[in-house]
Amino acid sequence: MEYLSEPLCEAMLILEKEERERTCIVIDVGARSTSVAFVKGDGLSNLTSFSMGGSYITSDLSEACGISYNDARNLKKEIVLSLKGNDSDFYELVTLGGRVTKIPLNFANEVVCYRLELIAKTVNECIRLFAKEYVPYYPIYLCGAGVSKIKGGKDFFAKCIGRNISYGLPPIPAMDKPEYASMLGLLNE
């Protein structure tokens, strides 16, 4: 039996060998948890995970907007964080029951931004804790569906972290999306 570290497999897939020779940071925001991995060569120099991810955003939307979890999941697919509306702008959500519900655009965006700020704050704490010689130019790659499937999510997340972020994309045609990096990394090993 062989143990495969999911963050290491993910990093080995999305990062070129030359890129791994210098330290890189891979952040994977999944549904229920987030991992922050420092990648150096063919290994991880540090790894930490915490319980907060995209499903927390969905739960926040459900609770704040008074809608079901499934309806909140559908609303999250419509969110565009780069939009700043006025009081008359809404997301129109067709609920699973078939009725149309109007959710104020700015309110829904604020709910999502609040949780993304919490995730980013925790990621920054992880980076500070484990990077004794943290160099501000270490490239950061974002994987997982927790942030990447939210329109404008990566840019807002980068702003919260205070760094440029690139998507960690698997080099596989038709599967080159950050939400597939973890799964394909494990299959690749």
State where each predicted segment sits.
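Gly/Thr-rich phosphate-binding beta-strand-loop-beta motif of the actin/hexokinase/Hsp70
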Residues: 18-47, 61
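Nucleotide/phosphate-binding catalytic cleft detector across ATP-hydrolyzing
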Residues: 1-25, 45, 68, 82-112, ...
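A polyampholytic, Gly/Pro-enriched intrinsically disordered region
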Residues: 22-29, 70-74, 182-189
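Phosphate/pyrophosphate-binding loops at sites that engage ATP/ADP/AMP, CoA/4′-phosphopantetheine
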Residues: 120-139
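Acidic-glycine-rich active-site phosphate/pyrophosphate-binding loop
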Residues: 29-32, 36, 151-167
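Glycine-rich phosphate-binding loops at beta-strand->alpha-helix junctions
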Residues: 81-83, 135-159
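Glycine-rich phosphate-binding/hydrolytic loop that grips phosphoryl groups
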Residues: 9-14, 166-189
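Glycine-rich phosphate-binding loop plus the immediately following alpha-helix
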Residues: 1-3, 43-81
